[in-house]
Swiss-Prot record:
Protein name, as recorded: Hemagglutinin
Listed HAMAP family: INFV_HEMA (MF_04072)
Gene name in the database record: HA
Family statement: Belongs to the influenza viruses hemagglutinin family.
GO MF terms held by the record: host cell surface receptor binding
InterPro entries per the UniProt record, alphabetical: Capsid_hemagglutn, Hemagglutn_HA1_a/b_dom_sf, Hemagglutn_influenz_A, Hemagglutn_influenz_A/B
Lipid-carrying residues in chain (S-palmitoyl cysteine): 566, 569
Record has Repeat as a keyword: no
Misc note: Major glycoprotein, comprises over 80% of the envelope proteins present in virus particle.
Organism, as annotated: Influenza A virus (strain A/Equine/Cambridge/1/1963 H7N7)
Record's comment on post-translational modification: Palmitoylated. In natural infection, inactive HA is matured into HA1 and HA2 outside the cell by one or more trypsin-like, arginine-specific endoprotease secreted by the bronchial epithelial cells. One identified protease that may be involved in this process is secreted in lungs by club cells.
Amino acid sequence: MNTQILILATSAFFYVRADKICLGHHAVSNGTKVDTLTEKGIEVVNATETVEQTNIPKICSKGKQTVDLGQCGLLGTVIGPPQCDQFLEFSANLIVERREGNDICYPGKFDNEETLRQILRKSGGIKKENMGFTYTGVRTNGETSACRRSRSSFYAEMKWLLSSTDNGIFPQMTKSYKNTKKVPALITWGIHHSGSTTEQTRLYGSGNKLITVWSSKYQQSFVPNPGPRPQINGQSGRIDFHWLMLDPNDTVTFSFNGAFIAPDRASFLRGKSLGIQSDAQLDNNCEGECYHIGGTIISNLPFQNINSRTIGKCPRYVKQKSLMLATGMKNVPEAPAHKQLTHHMRKKRGLFGAIAGFIENGWEGLIDGWYGYKHQNAQGEGTAADYKSTQSAINQITGKLNRLIEKTNQQFELIDNEFNEIEKQIGNVINWTRDSIIEVWSYNAEFLVAVENQHTIDLTDSEMNKLYEKVRRQLRENAEEDGNGCFEIFHQCDNDCMASIRNNTYDHKKYRKEAIQNRIQIDAVKLSSGYKDIILWFSFGASCFLFLAIAMGLVFICIKNGNMRCTICI
């Protein structure tokens, strides 16, 4: 009998320290905080920034046909002031305008300036075709000191038509041009507003002046308005330039009797390009696709916080300076006690800790994968990553950044220049609209990242649960869960046995008999906390009942012997 008790006690002692296999996940001592739909500041193992803040303070022009207009304004390439002589015809896929650039020489302005500027920025350059206009009875060599080359001159692409003699009669004229090309033609003309009525009479003769322009889609009449104005470049007169896009096979007709600045050549757009206003230096050693006034944004990120006004293939501008995208699982740093694997922690929390609700701590040493196993048996302790579950999670997380980029990237146009009086109202609307769009996209960006982060954390927890269920289904009744991500195995499980559990090749039938015997032996000597509680409550109840019975018996004896009297009053 004594021998049996000794053997049973020895067995109980051995299997309290039974072989174990635990499941866990990778952790780091210092993770990165991200926001999800339901919670802010969740720490994850890995995360990547989605907002670009690094600016290249140069115009990266490598691989591009770049035209730096310098002192020439972009609109000047159409009419031809002296500073634009080398850009009357050009080809480019990147057009750079400088702050010093000027569109005109004789003072004046363009009608619908910003619309024309946007057209030319995207033009890919321009080429010209002579319109074939000839004139009789007038002078075609009007010039001004405001447009100097070696001497007084005029716009290279325009003709300043004057009376044949000072104060002479300017004949009524009609000129037409048909666009025989397969692409639209840009037609530009001017209306001269003299500095005084006397000057207008000297240049174009007496009488009222009227200029009418029409095509199939356009009709407009202009009346010059002579009068004194502040002098600019020594001139008190002004020239207002007007333009239209003439469709193929359409004809434009000009009817005039003076004060008309006639077009000499029609302009044709070459293709496609980007145009940027910037004083940043050109750099042919770097490549870029996104530009702004301060330089180039080179980034594969979906968002940027550098400039709200950009052109090209650019990240979306958002107000946030940082939006972290989770690319790893929720981080639960390993507790110091788990690093030491003390006997106390083994007994209280299981061997290695855990995550995902039932696993309390991660493993900082698990560097080969996101998920893995740790085991303890007679041969010692070991750690191994689970590559299949790791790869499954990585495959689903990879591409999150690219998907964000696909949802957000598009070409943007830069509208950030001077507006005339009417266009200032449009400009205010554009600026208000842009600000509203920024607000919306800042919210959208935060929402998109939060959704992806929520999905990542839920996904990685799900993979952990799948791995746990795979082990539980293999072991069945051969092991018992300890509630901390570990399984206490009721048979001897060497390293090969542990490997079979990890590889999903474990044969529970092979160890079933040994496991059942050991489970019975353990249950015979080890009471669970539930049974202990039941016995304690039963014992307490029995003691109370016995005490009450003794007390009642004593009272009954005392009353019977007359030692105690009970009086009931009504």
